[in-house]
Curated annotation (Swiss-Prot):
Catalytic activity: [phosphate](n) + ATP = [phosphate](n+1) + ADP; [phosphate](n) + GTP = [phosphate](n+1) + GDP
SUPFAM superfamilies cross-referenced by the UniProt entry: P-loop containing nucleoside triphosphate hydrolases
Top-level lineage group: Bacteria
Protein name: ADP-polyphosphate phosphotransferase 3
Region annotation Disordered: where it falls in the sequence: 1-32, 260-284
InterPro entries named among the record's database cross-references: P-loop_NTPase (IPR027417), Polyphosphate_phosphotransfera (IPR016898), PPK2-related (IPR022488), PPK2_PA0141 (IPR022486)
GO molecular function: polyphosphate kinase activity
Purpose of the protein: Uses inorganic polyphosphate (polyP) as a donor to convert ADP to ATP. Can also convert GDP to GTP, with lower efficiency.
Pfam families: PPK2
EC numbers, comma separated: 2.7.4.-
Top EC group: transferase
UniProtKB keywords: ATP synthesis, Kinase, Plasmid, Transferase
Composition-biased stretches (Basic and acidic residues): 1-22, 260-277
Amino acid sequence: MDKHTDDRKKNNHWKAEDRKSAATEASETRSGGNYAKELARLQEEIAHLQAWVKKTGARIVIVFEGRDAAGKGGVIKRITERVSPRVFRVVALPAPTDREKTQIYMQRYIQQFPAAGEVVIFDRSWYNRPGVERVMGFCSEKKAKRFLEIAPRFEAAMIESGIVLLKYFLDVSEEEQDRRFRQRINDPLRQWKLSPMDVESYRRWWDYTRAYDEMIRMTDTDDAPWWIVPSDNKKQARVNCIAHILSSIPYERVKFEDPDLGKRQKRPADFEGDTRRRTVPNLF
């Protein structure tokens, strides 16, 4: 077993008292009072995680699944907005091409897996098969059932290879999803988020409920468990989820070295600036 995987249950820098503090402050985000403060604290810790990942060559995969409008994109944005996209890479694959449809189902996801020193975040993943593909009839019931049998073995192989795998399902109530969908309809800046597929998923709430229940039941294992994130409160969901990620990875803080800028070179005596450059108008 890879060291990164073998150490998962050991204490790391994000200690129990930190998790308790995160949970306490998360409860206060209902009023929004401490959200910015807590998020900043968590994002600073993510920067330490990034340094550790780069130093040790760790490989991490974080899967986000969930209801439409549950806030997956919002959580992912808060994880990645203060770190390097060269280390934290977000994968949101479109519908498979005709060529990809002829490949092994997992193949296009495997191609996105991390190299040493990378964290790959899947904004929806191979779990499209027992979710949207199954409910919408894009795959047969036989293929969906077969996927549910294979997925735990596939993920066991990932972990055996040294990948740290975390799986999160963002859950939102019927009432809150309804409110968010109607908010999108009435807001020109959010209408683009409401696709025909979203509308269809709204209508098939209970079909999705059955599919997701079986998906989680069949693919929740001790090595690759599903973690449910209650998401009716977006801010609370974000800080709870980020705190859990930090508590689940056995990273250690890496000392940041202050860079020495040295002296900047002097302007050459023979340098003449190019006065023909086009400059954006100063309107503000």
